[in-house]
């Protein structure tokens, strides 16, 4: 009986440790995104509306990501150029092979792995902010 109780307690402790280490890794990743200059940058003609974060629920949550939702009052190409200039100044490297008139992508390394930046006037993912016509997504 004692052996079975010990095994059960050990199993529960291991499960708790695995859960906590996974949760703390996701928390570190969220902090990494929030500490990046692109998370809080602002520009004239690009009005910040709010953010939408990936959900951590479910047995296998999606990658950690934050989408910043904006309404632009300047031409889309100008908005893309302003944002990508700031990204470059902040250490991001633009992926010029995926460049289009509506979308830009960039990447940067970190201790947690690679971070991706996605800037678009085309694919809008902001359900809470229907007036959104420009997004910046940062994902690990």
Show which residues each predicted segment covers.
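An acidic-aromatic pocket/loop used at catalytic or ligand-binding sites
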Residues: 2-6, 13-19, 23-140
């Amino acid at each position: 009986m004692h052996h079975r109780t010990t095994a059960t307690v050990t199993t529960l402790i291991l499960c708790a440790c695995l859960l906590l280490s996974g949760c703390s890794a996701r928390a570190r990743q969220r902090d990494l995104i929030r500490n990046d200059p692109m998370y809080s940058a602002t520009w004239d003609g690009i009005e910040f509306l709010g953010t939408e974060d990936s959900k951590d629920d479910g047995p296998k949550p999606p990658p950690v990501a934050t989408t910043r939702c904006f309404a632009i009052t300047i031409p889309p190409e100008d908005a893309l150029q302003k944002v990508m200039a700031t990204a470059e100044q902040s250490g991001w490297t633009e992926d010029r092979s995926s460049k289009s008139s509506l979308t830009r992508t960039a990447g940067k390394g970190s201790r947690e792995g690679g971070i991706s930046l996605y800037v678009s006037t085309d694919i809008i993912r902001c359900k809470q902010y229907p007036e959104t016509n420009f997004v910046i997504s940062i994902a690990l």
